[in-house]
């Protein structure tokens, strides 16, 4: 019987099977090969199975019964705990380099630059389950009607994602350590990625206002990257100076974008000047209100509301002949990591369901890495091999996951 179309594509484009087979593992006398374990977890994540227990069921008597064969949940957890996370990171970097060679990072709007976004997300928390790598915090919550203070164990990860491409491509993740903040974790991830991928792999970094700090900005510039970061109240001196220089908000027409650019605004904390772009965007939308009349009867009324949003973006980018609206485009591209990466991986990729955790911190790291790899390669397959064949494609990632699982269950005969 012919191999699955998804696996054939990954082998043809990325030589994926050979790379997975070369991954080192720490088991001495394994009953099942490391590639078999990796394939079960990876394909389970691609089919959007939420837990290792579900993958065990599918391997025994479900869609993977012929492709993988019987595997227990304990076997999967034991093997994942003995994979080296650095080796999985090296695999991810090799795939990222191949993506760049294949032109996946090209963009119609980024003016030849490869733009990456960095952000963090909490993936799990518990008052009971924990591992040696868990972070801790004290939380007040209600238990049996009483307000109690308990230690909560949780994990956060930082993610670097290319956002200038046609679809977001995560480059790497890093688990935040106990006592480490999100900015320090993200900076360590950036440094490790560029050390492995090369200093010219990325051109520009976009981030939320949390990252607009003097040490982080200096470290990013030392890596050779330009940056565009949201400017908010966490830098009050810079924000006040930008508001003083730039004009106040005008009367914007519906759907109109107003933009002001100050190429040199003094940043007192760093004793330097940075560029600041201010945008005012007015959006007109209709909403429905339900009101009651004098007799208490409900009446639906529609009204038009004009919503105005103001944003500031700080940057070290030398625009030259490039219009300042480019800074606005870069700043808004940061939302891709929230709306398309974190949200999709949480709802469809089950990022926040750590099916292996208690006492197995390394297994959780490797499981999360494999889920991110599965999400990335499924996106590549979906956009380059599925959507590209349709003029108007109505399929989504959930539809693709169901079809992948069905094709494993009912393989097509080889016509060769």
Regions found by a protein language model. Name each.
Residues 1-4, 16-21, 255-272, 346-416:
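A short, flexible helix-boundary coil/loop motif
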Residues 40, 55, 72-76, 112-126, ...:
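Short, conserved catalytic/metal-binding motifs centered on acidic residues
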Residues 77-165:
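Active-site-proximal, Lys/Arg-enriched surface segment
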Residues 138-201:
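Electropositive, glycine- and tryptophan-enriched low-complexity nucleic-acid-binding patches
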């Amino acid at each position: 019987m012919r191999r699955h179309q998804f696996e054939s594509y990954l082998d043809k484009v990325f030589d994926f099977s050979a790379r997975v087979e070369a991954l080192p593992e720490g088991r001495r006398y394994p009953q099942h090969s490391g590639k078999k374990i990796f394939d079960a977890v990876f394909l389970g994540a691609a089919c959007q199975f939420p837990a290792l227990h579900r993958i065990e069921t599918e391997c025994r008597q479900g869609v993977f019964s012929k492709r993988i064969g019987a595997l227990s949940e304990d076997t999967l957890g034991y093997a994942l705990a003995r994979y080296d996370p650095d080796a999985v990171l090296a695999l991810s970097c090799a795939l990222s380099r191949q993506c760049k060679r294949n032109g996946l990072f090209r963009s119609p709007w980024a003016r030849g630059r490869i733009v990456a976004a960095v952000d963090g997300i909490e993936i799990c928390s518990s008052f009971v389950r924990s591992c040696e790598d868990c972070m801790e915090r004290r939380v007040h919550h209600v238990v049996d009607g009483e307000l109690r203070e308990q230690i909560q164990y949780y994990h956060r990860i930082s993610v670097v994602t290319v956002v200038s491409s046609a679809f977001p491509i995560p480059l790497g993740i890093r688990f935040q350590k106990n006592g480490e903040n999100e900015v320090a974790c993200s900076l360590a991830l950036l440094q490790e990625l560029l050390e492995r991928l090369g200093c010219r792999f990325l051109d520009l970094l976009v981030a939320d206002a949390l990252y607009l700090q003097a040490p982080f900005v200096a470290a990013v510039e030392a890596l050779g990257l330009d940056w565009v970061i949201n400017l908010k109240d966490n830098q009050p001196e810079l924000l006040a100076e930008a508001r003083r220089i730039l004009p106040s908000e005008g009367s914007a027409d519906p759907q109109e974008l107003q933009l002001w650019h100050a190429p040199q605004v003094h940043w007192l904390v760093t004793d330097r000047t940075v560029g600041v772009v201010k945008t005012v965007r007015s959006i007109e939308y209709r909403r429905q209100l339900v009101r009651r009349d004098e007799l208490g009867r409900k009446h639906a009324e529609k009204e038009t509301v004009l919503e105005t949003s103001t944003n500031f973006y700080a940057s070290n980018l030398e625009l030259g002949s490039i219009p300042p609206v480019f800074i606005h485009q870069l700043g808004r591209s940061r939302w891709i990591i929230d709306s398309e990466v974190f949200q999709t991986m949480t709802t469809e990729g089950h990022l926040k369901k750590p099916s292996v955790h208690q006492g197995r911190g390394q297994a959780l790291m490797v499981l999360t890495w494999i889920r991110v790899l599965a999400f990335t390669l499924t996106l590549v397959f979906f956009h380059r091999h599925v959507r590209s064949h349709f003029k108007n494609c109505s399929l989504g990632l959930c539809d693709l996951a169901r079809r992948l699982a069905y094709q494993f269950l009912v393989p097509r005969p080889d016509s060769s």
